[in-house]
Amino acid sequence: MEEERDHNASESSLPSLSKQLESSTLGGSAVDVPVVDLSVSDEDFLVREVVKASEEWGVFQVVNHGIPTELMRQLQMVGTQFFELPDAEKETVAKEEDFEGYKKNYLGGINNWDEHLFHRLSPPSIINYKYWPKNPPQYREVTEEYTKHMKRLTEKILGWLSEGLGLQRETFTQSIGGDTAEYVLRVNFYPPTQDTELVIGAAAHSDMGAIALLIPNEVPGLQAFKDEQWLDLDYIDSAVVVIIGDQLMRMTNGRLKNVLHRAKSDKDKLRISWPVFVAPRADMSVGPLPEFTGDENPPKFETLIYNDYIDQKIRGWALEDLPVY
């Protein structure tokens, strides 16, 4: 228990706001995070590359991933069209008590300066279409097609991670619930701001779930905290950004890295991103798998019901760092 409390403190103890703003390569040269080309026929090579990137960085990009370029274009089109609607129309899918729905965060302070749309994608039993925009009319069709591709890609990556760490291919997929694992989309809309050195589009955080797959538009802004500094990530056109979350880190007893990351707004250009978060069911127990623990490597984390983990992590965040969802 003591180890768990200590590590949870480190998970939720984010760099101070001054550190977040000062220690950054923003405006300088972006760094190249690992890139994995899925068109490579040598699957053993892909397994090694995915594991290495997840252990050393906790974030990487995949190219030639099989998601049609036209579908990605349509996804960006319908998302942009939604945020261009009048506020009154966007408010028809506004948040109520749950995290789902539309929200605008321009409330002063520097964190979470954005608008966003949040809703569940899968499994079908948890989808609430009242939070899916009816305008633009193609939104649902495009998003459902995109979900199919993202699920296939997620399961491929989880399978490679499992195999690369000496597990059965389905281990990580089944450990987060298999077909009942929850997929959630958040469309982030970061408008231009002249106060780029004073405003953070999305505050520094690690993802609470297992893994996230993200597509941004062409405007840079995603940053990762590595080697005691914030690094701007150089995005490759049509790539998918893969981000390792807390639960894969916990299941592997710390072997995989849950990367701390944030989003910055641009001075002149609109930035939009489409992360899909993949997480266990709320009632699932998640903790170190036996393959990663032993007499010389005791569990670093307590096995917790996922919903309890969420509550514990949120309580550990400072109010100013709390994501607004």
Swiss-Prot record:
It comes from the Eukaryota. The keyword Hydrolase does not apply. Its EC number is 1.14.20.6. InterPro entries: DIOX_N (IPR026992), IPNS-like_FE2OG_OXY (IPR044861), IPNS-like_sf (IPR027443), Oxoglu/Fe-dep_dioxygenase_dom (IPR005123), Plant_2OG-oxidoreductases (IPR050295). Fe cation binds at H205, D207, H261. Its cofactor is Fe(2+). Disruption phenotype: No visible phenotype under normal growth conditions. It catalyses: a (2R,3R)-dihydroflavonol + 2-oxoglutarate + O2 = a flavonol + succinate + CO2 + H2O. Expressed in young seedlings. Belongs to the iron/ascorbate-dependent oxidoreductase family. This is Probable flavonol synthase 5. The gene is FLS5.
